Amino acid sequence: MEYNKLSNEIIAKLQALVGVQNVVTDAGQMEIYAHDEVTDPAYHHMPEAVVFAENAQQVAAVVKLANEYHFPVVPRGAGTGLACGAVPIYGGVVLSLEKMNKIIEVNADAMYAVVEPGVRTSDLQAAAAAKGAFYAGDPCSGDSCFIGGNVATNAGGNRAVKYGTTRHQVYAVEVVNPTGKIVQLGARLQKQTTGYCLEQLIIGSEGTLGIITQITVKLLPLPKYSMDLLAVFEAPEDAIGTVNKLIMAGIMPTCVEYMDNITIKSVERYLGTSLQGSEKGNYLIVEVEGTSEDDLDEKACTMDEICSENGAGDVLVAEHDKIWQARKAFAEAVRAESLIVCKEDVVCPVDHEPALLAEILRLADKYQLVTRIASHAGDGNIHLNILKQEQEDYADWDARVKANQQELYRFIYAHGGRLSGEHGIGYKRKQLMEEFTNPDELEMMRAIKKALDPNNILNPGKIFDIE
């Protein structure tokens, strides 16, 4: 793909649009915008400029200029992505939305909030809770990621098993389209069948079809009663195999999370702490909400019985803060062990999850890969982290990782799965997307991209290539 470089004339025009203070061209200051949370330098690409937008009008003006001068624009939130979705692989402008960070409205009576894309997810949760309401989106990076990035990637997280992913929390979005027009998509309605559902098209499109500048999200009543159970299993397949049994028993958990024992030990080292039952096996962390203490007790008894019948050696009431700190420290603990990690985000139907985990373990042994595994087990989403060891040759390690991927993805697609559950495709998984996705699906996606972004300005080279 050919794009024009940013000339002094273009830089001056950008400065006129957003202010001199909001345009950065110094290489040292731009380095952090050359990558997301993928630490492998092979995936890093420097922008030619970083532009900080303060409102939708500035975003629109930058996109119009990009179409006029034919340079790429890569929207960026907090940079916490794991698929290189905000990496400027063709240079051009990284358009940062971090200054668009206002919580515009929290309406607990009508159960909605309106926010800008640069609002931290945990800040939205706190603002809702302060009004007695609840925002259900809960990615593990909630203390650092932005709500705009959540929408752009359709982020999942711990509570997706009960409340769904980000797309289930969004009523409407304001978007700057690829030609620079500000458009309103969706409405604060519980249902509608009024033409195409365009706001849902934008959600999960990773900045390739529009730049999100405002979001109206759904709020729920703040849960009054909840508890966390920790079931410890010696056998990984028993832990994962219990998930569907819990759901089929009529218990709808808020969260069901899996951590294998070696990952638990890694997190203990990273946090410098000792976790309940860590010496006994693999974790299944189950959070459940109830209408009363008695309701919780009844659900806890049922879960204890099901877990014990299916191989749990211990079923404990978990220390809430400590167990969730441990689960959410997974990524940081892995990073502390190795800076070069292949992070897989595979997803399959929940009833196929035990078979998928068994295949992951078989392939890791076959290709002699060091792994750390955690899972949003309640929705079939397994996070397989493959760590390069210091003594391993990079080329040899990378070849084994790629061979593992080929077998793994063939297995996943044969079992009705997909290669990403919540992290997105970005640049990192683009080749695999094109290799394993149904050609008819890809053709439809490309047709949409070409129709909405005829100059291929917005986040080019992500998800798939334009032929």
Regions found by a protein language model. Name each.
Residues 102-257, 458:
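FAD-binding subdomain of flavoenzyme oxidoreductases
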